[in-house]
């Protein structure tokens, strides 16, 4: 049952509890398991991958069958409908168009005495994309991770994903990968896949950046290999916070709440509204839509533990509460959403108006759906082209510029006791 909370102190406490739902305290057992997997893959390479795949996925592989071959890639196109292929291609087009606008440009500026300063952006050489298996196939995850890497100019893009029954990979995932330009695909998942990407094996060369969502073990593995490789984020369960006025449609709000809850038993679905009548209507609509929901058990668990409706005095108070929660997805289902946007400080993505369900951002609109969760929107942003880029500073001094500023450099170097730093300038200033 979706709860309605009317007391502000209780509402704040519940929002904090939900935000902290993935703070599992001691995870020593899981961390130890992941550490052992990482060490084993780093040491034994393909043999470890094959043994872990047999242990966890109950699939028997060989070094020759780790990589998805061309005939399986070709066959995938015969197994998807024209409607799905068209949808994948439209999504690719719009995601690519959006991310091309976000590519930063290298620059230089010319200062006094011939000083040249600048910044040069370059892509990483290789990126590894993790695509979950398990409850569902996620071609959208492929597109959202691969396309920014392509736009950034990454030369080698690798995808890893757990194998299904018969060693197969979902054809929709394979088609999305090919549409996004990926041909190097491996049927391996879990922490062992992250280890392979980070350390390399006989079959899977290492990469520079790893992106993509996964379960707790994948997240812990990404956390532990960070530093050896870059990562996008430590993503937790999905979440939506909806701010709605009395004119919002209850059934539509209910569908948006359930759209998050159906992801995961830990998913959060929150509505903040000043309208008690809307709140009650949403509860009714949620119950009606759950009645024949194909993922009813999973979705009900999320709604029961991490779903709520909070009654607020004003929409402005709702925004203040949202900022403290820093949701992954924020929907402003109000008559004038632009009047609230400037007050929003912390949100992964903001969806404006009654006709903008979060699902359009998940699949098609263009902005990335890989977003910060569990309050991380306070300091983090969506995955994007920048995830696959790095920048180098450019500095050039002329003799005149060094004569003018060298004294200050030497003073600072002497203050820090770094005599060779001082002398590297002094020797250049000698006649």
UniProtKB/Swiss-Prot annotation:
Pathway: Amino-acid biosynthesis; L-histidine biosynthesis; L-histidine from 5-phospho-alpha-D-ribose 1-diphosphate: step 9/9. Its cofactor is Zn(2+). One of its GO terms (cellular component) is cytosol. Signal peptide: none annotated. Its EC number is 1.1.1.23. It comes from the Bacteria. One of its GO terms (molecular function) is zinc ion binding. The active site is at residues 328-329. GO terms for biological process: L-histidine biosynthetic process. Substrate binds at residues 238, 260, 263, 329, 362, 416, 421. Binds 1 zinc ion per subunit. Keywords: Amino-acid biosynthesis, Histidine biosynthesis, Metal-binding, NAD, Oxidoreductase, Zinc. Zn(2+) binds at residues 260, 263, 362, 421. It catalyses: L-histidinol + 2 NAD(+) + H2O = L-histidine + 2 NADH + 3 H(+). NAD(+) binds at residues 130, 192, 215. Belongs to the histidinol dehydrogenase family. Catalyzes the sequential NAD-dependent oxidations of L-histidinol to L-histidinaldehyde and then to L-histidine. This is Histidinol dehydrogenase. It comes from Thermosynechococcus vestitus (strain NIES-2133 / IAM M-273 / BP-1). The gene is hisD.
């Amino acid at each position: 049952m979706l709860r309605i909370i009317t007391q502000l102190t209780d509402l704040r406490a519940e929002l904090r509890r939900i935000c902290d739902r993935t703070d599992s305290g001691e995870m020593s057992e899981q961390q130890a398991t992941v550490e052992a997997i990482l060490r084993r893959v780093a040491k034994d390479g393909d043999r470890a991958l094959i043994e872990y795949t047999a242990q966890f996925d109950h699939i028997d592989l060989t070094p020759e069958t780790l990589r998805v071959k061309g005939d399986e890639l070709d066959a995938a196109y015969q197994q998807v409908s024209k409607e799905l292929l068209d949808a994948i291609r439209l999504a690719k087009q719009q995601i690519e168009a959006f991310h091309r606008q976000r590519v930063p440009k290298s620059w230089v500026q010319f200062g006094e005495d011939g000083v040249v300063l600048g910044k040069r952006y370059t892509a990483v050489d290789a990126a590894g994309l993790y695509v979950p298996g398990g409850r569902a196939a996620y071609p959208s995850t492929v597109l959202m991770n691969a396309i920014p890497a392509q736009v950034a100019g990454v030369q080698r893009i690798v995808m890893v994903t757990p194998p299904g029954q018969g060693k197969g990979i979902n054809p929709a995932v394979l088609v999305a990968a090919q549409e996004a330009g990926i041909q190097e695909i491996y049927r391996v998942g879990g922490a062992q896949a992250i280890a392979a990407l980070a350390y390399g094996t006989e079959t899977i060369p290492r990469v520079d950046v790893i992106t993509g969502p996964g379960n707790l073990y994948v997240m812990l593995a990404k956390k532990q290999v960070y530093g050896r490789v870059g990562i996008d984020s430590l993503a937790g369960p999905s979440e939506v916070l909806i701010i709605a006025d009395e004119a919002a449609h209850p059934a539509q709000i209910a569908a948006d709440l359930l759209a998050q809850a159906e992801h995961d038993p830990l998913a959060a679905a929150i509505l903040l509204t000043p309208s008690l009548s809307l709140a009650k209507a949403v509860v009714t609509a949620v119950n009606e839509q759950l009645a024949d929901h194909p993922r009813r058990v999973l979705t009900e668990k999320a709604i029961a533990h991490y779903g709520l409706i909070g009654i607020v005095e004003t929409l402005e108070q709702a925004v203040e509460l949202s900022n403290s929660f820093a949701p992954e997805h924020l929907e402003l289902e109000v008559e004038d959403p632009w009047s609230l946007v400037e007050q929003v400080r912390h949100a992964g993505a903001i969806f404006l108006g009654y006709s903008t369900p979060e699902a359009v951002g998940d699949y098609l609109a263009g902005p990335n759906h890989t977003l910060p969760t569990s309050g991380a929107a306070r300091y983090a942003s969506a995955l994007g082209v920048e995830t696959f880029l790095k920048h180098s500073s450019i500095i050039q001094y002329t003799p005149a510029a060094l004569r003018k500023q060298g004294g200050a450099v030497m003073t600072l170097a002497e203050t820090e006791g770094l005599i060779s730093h001082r002398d590297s300038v002094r020797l250049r200033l000698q006649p």
